[in-house]
């Protein structure tokens, strides 16, 4: 078996998650690059959503022993507990660390951030309470529980990458144990299925965060191989020679047709993408072949 990695760089529409707020004001998480501000969906938020949606967290057990952490011991470790595939640090009775077999980047917006502020309140709830308790809403606002609030909002095209070290899936060196090849295939497939049909929720907004454009496959490079050559701006992919050369190293490109990109016809003509369903189907076949 060759020591290889599965890597994907994905472009999808999604809502940003939120950082610390100030009073009743919530701000989206952002990064600063080249003097500009870009909204993000953090890698922690993405990873948690993928682990939950894939069912990988279904067997999660948590213990609180000075710190809140995943339960790990000789009977429950990364070889037989899917929830531990994303890594763990156990400090009881001694410290044991098992790194994740896959890594995500933040999902960074393709275009600079434009502030869209939304204003809301709980008027209906406050009105119902005021009516039930004979309170004059306009005169006794605090007593009625009326609370205005506002938050920044960003739903935009974002780019992120995920890379698996395929030889670390299901392996726990802390307990010298390893999952079966069938279990390894199931774990990778579960995460791929979640990414293909990813749905994200934040502040009551349900996002269809399925991939619109995807580059990747299984290869020798244990890094986010396409991260530095996939560039989308103003809904247009920059089709460079470096991008084409990397695709020539045995990788594929998939697209969800529907006019999501201004130069969709150029992408189809120059990169010859396959459908999104075919991309994931072939990738799952590659994973099965790799482990078998």
Task: Kindly give the residue locations of the regions a language model identified.
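RNA-binding basic/glycine-rich loop and surface signature characteristic of RAMP-family CRISPR effectors
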Residues: 1-292
């Amino acid at each position: 078996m060759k020591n290889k990695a599965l890597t994907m760089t994905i472009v999808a529409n999604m809502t940003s998650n939120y950082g610390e707020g100030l009073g009743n004001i919530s701000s989206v998480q952002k990064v600063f690059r080249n003097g500009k501000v870009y909204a993000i969906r953090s890698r922690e938020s993405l990873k948690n959503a993928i682990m939950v949606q894939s069912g990988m967290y279904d067997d999660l057990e948590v213990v609180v022993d000075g710190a809140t952490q995943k339960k790990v011991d000789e009977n429950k470790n990364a070889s037989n507990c899917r929830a531990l595939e994303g890594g763990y640090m156990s400090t009881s009775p001694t410290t044991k660390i098992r790194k994740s077999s896959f890594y995500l980047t933040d999902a960074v917006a393709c275009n600079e951030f434009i502030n869209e502020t939304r204003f809301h309140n709980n008027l209906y709830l406050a009105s119902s309470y005021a009516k039930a308790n004979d309170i004059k809403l306009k005169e006794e606002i605090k007593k009625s529980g009326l609370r205005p609030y506002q938050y920044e909002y960003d739903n935009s095209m974002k780019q992120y990458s995920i890379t698996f070290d395929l030889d670390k899936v299901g392996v726990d060196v802390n307990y010298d144990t390893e999952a079966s090849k069938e279990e390894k295939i199931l774990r990778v497939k579960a995460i791929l299925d979640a990414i293909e049909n990813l749905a994200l929720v934040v502040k009551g907004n349900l996002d269809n965060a399925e991939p619109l454009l995807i580059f990747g496959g299984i290869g020798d490079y244990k890094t986010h191989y396409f991260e530095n050559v996939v560039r989308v701006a103003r809904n247009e992919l920059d089709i460079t020679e470096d991008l084409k050369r990397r695709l020539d190293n045995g990788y594929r490109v998939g697209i969800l047709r529907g006019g999501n990109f201004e130069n969709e016809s150029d992408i189809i003509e120059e990169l010859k993408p396959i459908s999104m369903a075919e991309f994931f189907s072939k990738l799952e076949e590659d994973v099965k072949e790799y482990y078998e």
